[in-house]
Amino acid sequence: MPISQKNQNFIDRTFSIIANILLRIIPTTSGEKEAFAYYINGMSAQSEGNYAEALQNYYQAMHLEMDPYDRSYILYNIGIIHTSNGEHSKALEYYCRAIERNPFLPQAFNNMAVICHYRGEQAIQQGDSEIAEAWFDQAAEYWKQARTLTPGNYIEAQNWLTITWRSK
């Protein structure tokens, strides 16, 4: 096993142990603890590439979790899975739902921008420059929002915004 994979496994195990300890000591309701357990199980399955299992856990967590901020991260992770599966429309829907609950989620804005940029590239390949420009404009708006929330991050996005005259 490569060293980086060993490190990742160690980090995943350490995170799981710490999460279980926190579940026991932090004063929360049993529903909140159960929601968090499903969320952790979802993250574990997702990191192993078991997307169907991860989605089941995330949906259970969504059913139990009432806090909008915590729900935003569940929705965000569901979006990541749909992105990984090439289900971009579903991914965009989940990223939007995450942002509705937590407008300070730059990674969701970034992922939405990446999908829009990808769709713009697809439109160019299909010879539809007007649709491509609309997708690129939308990508630019999402990247601007991500960069506003985390100045100094998403440097490649900033470079793209600059060279395409979309930075303002």
Curated annotation (Swiss-Prot):
Q: Which GO terms describe its cellular component?
A: plastid membrane; thylakoid membrane
This protein's UniProt keywords: Membrane, Photosynthesis, Plastid, Repeat, TPR repeat
Checking Pfam families in the record gives:
TPR_12
Topologically, how does it sit relative to the membrane? Peripheral membrane protein
Q: Which InterPro entries match?
A: PSI_Ycf3_assembly, TPR-like_helical_dom_sf, TPR_rpt, Ycf3/AcsC/BcsC/TPR_MFPF
Q: Where are the TPR repeats?
A: 35-68, 72-105, 120-153
The biological processes this protein is annotated with in GO are:
photosynthesis
* Record's subcellular location: Plastid membrane
Q: What does this protein do?
A: Essential for the assembly of the photosystem I (PSI) complex. May act as a chaperone-like factor to guide the assembly of the PSI subunits.
Give the NCBIfam families listed for this entry.
Answer: PRK02603.1 (NF002725)
Matching entries from HAMAP family are given as:
Ycf3
State the PANTHER family in the record.
Answer: CELLULOSE SYNTHASE OPERON PROTEIN C, TPR REPEAT-CONTAINING PROTEIN MJ0263
Q: Which family does it belong to?
A: Belongs to the Ycf3 family.
What is this protein identified as?
Photosystem I assembly protein Ycf3
Origin species: Cuscuta gronovii
Taxonomic classification: Eukaryota, Viridiplantae, Streptophyta, Embryophyta, Tracheophyta
Which gene codes for it?
ycf3
